Regions:
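Bacterial N-terminal signal peptides that target proteins for export
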Residues: 7-31, 568
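A cross-kingdom C-terminal cell-surface attachment/processing module
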Residues: 567-590
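Signature for phosphate-centric chemistry
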Residues: 48-174, 180-420, 424-548
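Extracellular Ser/Thr-rich, low-complexity/disordered mucin-like segments
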Residues: 549-573
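Ala/Thr-enriched low-complexity intrinsically disordered regions
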Residues: 2, 9-10, 17, 547-548, ...
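Classical Sec-dependent N-terminal signal peptides that target proteins to the secretory pathway
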Residues: 32-36
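C-terminal segment of classical bacterial N-terminal signal peptides
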Residues: 37-46
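N-terminal prepro-regions of secreted/extracellular proteins
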Residues: 46, 560, 565-566, 590-593
Length: 593
């Protein structure tokens, strides 16, 4: 493929699968070995909840193991690679803005003045940790990829090149790379292309396709009035505003969840290792114990900017003065947000700005799970399967699915674009996963305007949705497409291309109702995919070589009834465990305003 070469040196320790360790002529052999390695189904192990760190959507990406890759099913005999396409969340990042660190700093100042820390030493260390994580984010850039994020996407690019070596060997094939336009998404694409071996390829901003949830684009422009993209974003924003405002069902559900006795108990339990009982009880009781993200912590004061930051170069280093801590639950959740983002900042957590927020959760593992639940609830309701009988939160991703099919159709029609790589956000992946009915994204919550019990809301016991599984950092959905030359005797027309899916680089079946080409196969005819995912008519059998009349009335995938089991049989990715240990390295940093 034009432009494919070896990745540039980054100063990082080489990945065992790095293209730098594979001779150009051996890529085809490598891909063939992978293809022939196994025909069994890929079933990633389910992790034990007791070993999890409960990082919610801040879970660092876990690269596929050799066993995961070896489990990829080869294409049926006679079929060869035609195209590949991806949509991926950005990789691990630092804090998205000067918010959690600032809010806890304002709270800590009050605690220090009132003797609210258990001991002066605990207070000194707590504030030092806050100062350190702020300094690390100022140096790295708020919202920018961390070293882990760069490594995650470089590795993904390397594996994509190895898996599709035969496709990329054709110099007549082109690659298209697209970004939402947000800096961290663009950085992710750049690092992916570095791993792929095409670092000079420019990324095309596509906020219409990859930032569909907002009218305002990442660069400050707005989607053009009167366009479908603008209308879709306006409808989504209006729906979420109505649902999360007073009287909204989502607002009622999240309020019920946050006010569950367990929320208060675990928050006070966590904070009791740092603050006195009296200070915890005072949180939110009056204006002096309510903190805003401002220069003095008071409501209505000016925004604050992180010490040492250049707001012109890093506007996210300045606060949103509306953010606040109004209760012990707010304070604990703010601390939890620093704990989980620290897992994505291992290479930045070095002198002179070392920090340790994990210490506050030692012995509080079940509390961390509860905080993950609280954080997951918001994403589930606003971006995921949400409420039974509603699809507004994920139908907004329909243009992305349409684009996946467009890429295939264009290629089948003779186009030269053989690979399309898209880089976006959790706000892209979560609704796309629900639209595709991917594992864990199949069960909505009850549509109850006034929840009276846990049975009326999203709950871990009855719903499989987990942010750490659905949308970890660098989460991705990849489709590989294969084709076969000649005429299919079963149809008298050209052979229909086949598609298989990787979810976070583990091969999985398409949703229930999408019929594969053979029993036990993960490969599906593109016509069958269109039928089961979009309702398009289908005039051929979903099976290879089957001349029997097709029944295109078989229903496609639907969201399961609310409640129910945990979808464990189909949820093969398991709880993703933190498995990072990359050495600190020198790296290229690209900052964008």
């Amino acid at each position: 493929m034009a432009g494919i070469g070896h990745p540039q040196a980054t100063g990082r320790s080489p990945d065992p699968t790095s293209l730098d360790r594979v001779k150009p002529g051996s890529l085809l052999t490598y891909a063939a070995v992978l293809a022939a390695a196994s025909t069994f189904l890929a079933v990633p192990a389910q992790a034990d909840d007791t070993d999890a760190d409960f990082y919610s959507s801040k879970q660092p990406y876990i690269a596929p193991t050799d066993a995961d890759i070896a489990a990829y099913q080869p294409a049926p005999a006679g079929y060869s690679p035609l195209a590949t396409e991806t949509v991926a969340r950005h990789g691990s990042r630092g804090l998205s803005g000067y918010k959690y660190d600032l809010l806890l700093h304002r709270l800590a100042e009050t605690a220090q003045a009132e003797g609210g820390f258990l001991t002066p030493e605990i207070g000194t260390e707590f504030i030092a940790n806050l100062d350190a994580i702020t300094a690390a984010n100022v140096e790295n850039g708020y919202g920018m990829l961390t070293g882990q994020g760069e490594t995650q996407h470089q590795g993904m690019g390397e594996r994509a090149a190895a898996r599709n070596a035969a496709l990329f060997a054709d110099a007549g094939n082109r690659i298209v790379a697209e970004t939402s336009g947000e800096s961290r998404a663009t950085e992710s694409g750049e690092n992916f292309l570095l791993g792929l071996g095409d670092a000079d390829l420019a990324l095309e901003p596509r906020p219409d396709l990859l930032y569909f949830h907002k009218v305002e684009n990442p660069d400050g422009t707005e989607k053009a009035p009167g366009t479908p993209e603008r209308e879709r974003a306006e409808a989504y924003e209006a729906y979420i505003e109505a649902q999360t405002d007073d009287g909204g069902t989502i607002a009622a559900a999240t309020e019920f969840i946050e006010e569950r006795p367990e929320s208060v108990r675990v928050s006070e339990e966590l904070l009791s290792g740092i603050f006195t009982a009296e200070f915890i009880a005072a949180m939110g009781a009056d204006a002096a114990h309510t903190w805003y993200a401002t220069v003095d912590g008071a409501k209505g004061s000016a925004p604050a900017c992180a010490p040492g930051a250049d707001p012109a170069a890093d506007p996210d280093a300045c606060s949103d003065p509306k953010k606040s801590i109004k209760s012990a639950v707010d304070a604990a959740m703010t601390l939890y947000n620093l704990y989980i983002i620290a897992a994505d900042m291992e290479e930045e957590n070095v002198a002179p700005h070392e920090f340790d927020f994990a210490q506050y959760f030692d012995g509080h593992e079940t509390d961390a799970e509860w905080f993950a639940y609280l954080l997951d609830a918001e994403d589930f309701y606003e971006k995921g399967p949400s409420l039974a009988g509603h699809d507004e939160t994920y139908a907004v991703a329909q243009p992305l699915l349409d684009d996946f099919f467009r890429v295939i159709d264009d290629r089948v029609a003779g186009g030269d674009v053989a690979a399309t790589f898209r880089f976006a956000h959790a706000e892209t992946i979560v609704p796309f996963a629900a639209l595709l009915k991917l594992p864990g994204s199949t069960v909505p919550a009850p549509d109850v305007a006034a929840p009276a019990s846990v049975d009326d809301v999203f709950d871990y016991a009855s719903n499989p949705w987990r942010g750490s599984q659905v949308t970890p950092m660098a989460a991705n959905v990849q489709w590989d497409v294969v084709s076969r030359a000649g005429v299919d005797p079963a149809t008298g027309a050209a052979y229909t291309p086949l598609v298989r899916m990787l979810y976070n680089e583990r091969e999985i079946a398409f949703a229930d109702g999408c019929r594969p080409v053979a029993e036990g196969s993960h490969w599906v005819k593109v016509t069958e995919l269109k039928r089961c995912l979009t309702g398009a008519a289908m005039a051929e059998s979903p099976l290879i070589g089957d001349t029997a009349p097709v029944d295109d009335t078989v229903p496609g995938p639907e969201l399961a009834a609310t409640g129910g089991g945990t979808d464990a049989a189909t949820w093969g990715l398991g709880i993703l465990l933190l498995a990072v240990g990359a050495a600190a390295v020198s790296r290229r940093r690209v900052f964008r305003d």
